[in-house]
C-alpha cells in the first residue's frame, strides 16, 4: 500500500510543475493546462487525506472542484478562441495590447 507521504510528495511535485509552467510559459493554452495540473494536484491531496483520515468530505470536495474546473475550461477555451479570432495569436503578451 502506498503511504500518505508518497501521495503528498507526488501532489507537491505536480503543483510545483504547474506553478513553474504558469510563471514561465507565454502560450495561453499551456498556461491553461498548467492551471488544470495544479487543480489536479490539489484534488490528489484531498483524495489522499480523505482516504487516510477515513472521511468522505475530501472526496465530495473534489467533485465540486472538478465541476468548477469544467466550467473554467469552457469559459477559458471560449475566451481563447475569441482572442485568437481577434489577434490570430494566443500569446499572453498580446493580451496587454487589448483595450476595453
Curated annotation (Swiss-Prot):
Signal peptide location: none
Record's keyword terms, sorted: Cell inner membrane, Cell membrane, Membrane, NAD, Quinone, Translocase, Transmembrane, Transmembrane helix, Transport, Ubiquinone
Assembly, per entry: NDH-1 is composed of 14 different subunits. Subunits NuoA, H, J, K, L, M, N constitute the membrane sector of the complex.
Annotated function: NDH-1 shuttles electrons from NADH, via FMN and iron-sulfur (Fe-S) centers, to quinones in the respiratory chain. The immediate electron acceptor for the enzyme in this species is believed to be ubiquinone. Couples the redox reaction to proton translocation (for every two electrons transferred, four hydrogen ions are translocated across the cytoplasmic membrane), and thus conserves the redox energy in a proton gradient.
Positions of disulphide bridges: none
Cellular component, GO, one term: NADH dehydrogenase complex
Subcellular location: Cell inner membrane
Gene source species: Geobacter sulfurreducens (strain ATCC 51573 / DSM 12127 / PCA)
Transmembrane segments annotated in the record for this chain: 4-24, 29-49, 60-80
Protein's UniProt name: NADH-quinone oxidoreductase subunit K 1
Amino acid at each position: 500500500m502506498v503511504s500518505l507521504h508518497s501521495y503528498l510528495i507526488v501532489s507537491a511535485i505536480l503543483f510545483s510543475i504547474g506553478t513553474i509552467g504558469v510563471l514561465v510559459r507565454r502560450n495561453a493554452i499551456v498556461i491553461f493546462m498548467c492551471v488544470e495540473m495544479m487543480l489536479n494536484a490539489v484534488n490528489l491531496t484531498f483524495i489522499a487525506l480523505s482516504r487516510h483520515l477515513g472521511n468522505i468530505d475530501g472526496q465530495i470536495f473534489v467533485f465540486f472542484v472538478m465541476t468548477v474546473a469544467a466550467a473554467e475550461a469552457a469559459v477559458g477555451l471560449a475566451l481563447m478562441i475569441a482572442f485568437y479570432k481577434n489577434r490570430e495569436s494566443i500569446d499572453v503578451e498580446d493580451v496587454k495590447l487589448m483595450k476595453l
